[in-house]
């Protein structure tokens, strides 16, 4: 895997003061992903970690179709106040790895009655196309071998097992009428622990 690491910069946020680095990943077929790591000044032996895949509609625009924006905010708040410190790894894998353009097309199919997994399949994609290999490199860079992982996704736990000893912590946010069916599909078809 080829990647490069930016310089470290301060990142004051509404949740607290953090530091940040970007990992530029050179993927297959000349793809380029610029991931962001937001972390506390001190990282203890077992930091609190959230692996968060980009969701422009939820994270930036506050879409109620998913739980992403709420999970991002809750994770940042918990990391900021965790005694062992922590980090949020923001992976540029929009739409569970299918990209923004295809995600919007999947949304259009959802408007016609397909669920989130069926919509991806109609577009020729699996239900989840994400890769977590870069996370292993990020953990190496920060000398992380044990983590408390904020996730409801068992696939993330399995994917990170080669890189660190993982203890899962749920991240539960309130549902709303727009995302209840979506959350049920994540539970039933993607195995999320909700």
Curated annotation (Swiss-Prot):
CDD domains: GTP_cyclohydro2. The active site is at residues 128, 130. Pathway: Cofactor biosynthesis; riboflavin biosynthesis; 5-amino-6-(D-ribitylamino)uracil from GTP: step 1/4. GTP binds at residues 50-54, 94-96, 116, 151, 156. GO terms for cellular component: cytosol. Zn(2+) binds at residues 55, 66, 68. Its cofactor is Zn(2+). Catalyzes the conversion of GTP to 2,5-diamino-6-ribosylamino-4(3H)-pyrimidinone 5'-phosphate (DARP), formate and pyrophosphate. Belongs to the GTP cyclohydrolase II family. This is GTP cyclohydrolase-2. The gene is ribA.
């Amino acid at each position: 895997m080829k990647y490069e690491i930016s310089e470290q910069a301060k990142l004051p946020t509404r949740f607290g003061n953090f530091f940040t680095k970007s990992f530029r990943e050179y993927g297959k077929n000349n793809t380029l992903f610029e991931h962001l790591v937001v972390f506390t000044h001190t990282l203890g032996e077992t930091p609190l970690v959230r692996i968060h895949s980009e969701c422009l509609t939820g994270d930036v625009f506050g879409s109620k179709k998913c739980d992403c924006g709420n999970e991002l905010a809750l994770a940042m708040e918990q990391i900021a106040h965790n005694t062992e410190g922590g980090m949020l790894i923001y992976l540029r894998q929009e739409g569970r790895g299918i990209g923004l353009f295809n995600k919007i097309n999947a949304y259009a199919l959802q408007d016609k009655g397909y669920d989130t997994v069926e919509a991806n399949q109609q577009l020729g994609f699996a239900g989840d196309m994400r890769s977590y290999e870069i996370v292993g490199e990020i953990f190496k860079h920060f000398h992380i071998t044990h983590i408390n992982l904020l996730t409801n996704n068992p696939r993330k736990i399995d994917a990170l097992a080669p890189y660190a000893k993982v203890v899962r912590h749920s991240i539960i946010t309130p549902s709303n009428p727009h995302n209840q069916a979506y959350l049920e599909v994540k539970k039933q078809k993607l195995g999320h622990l909700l």
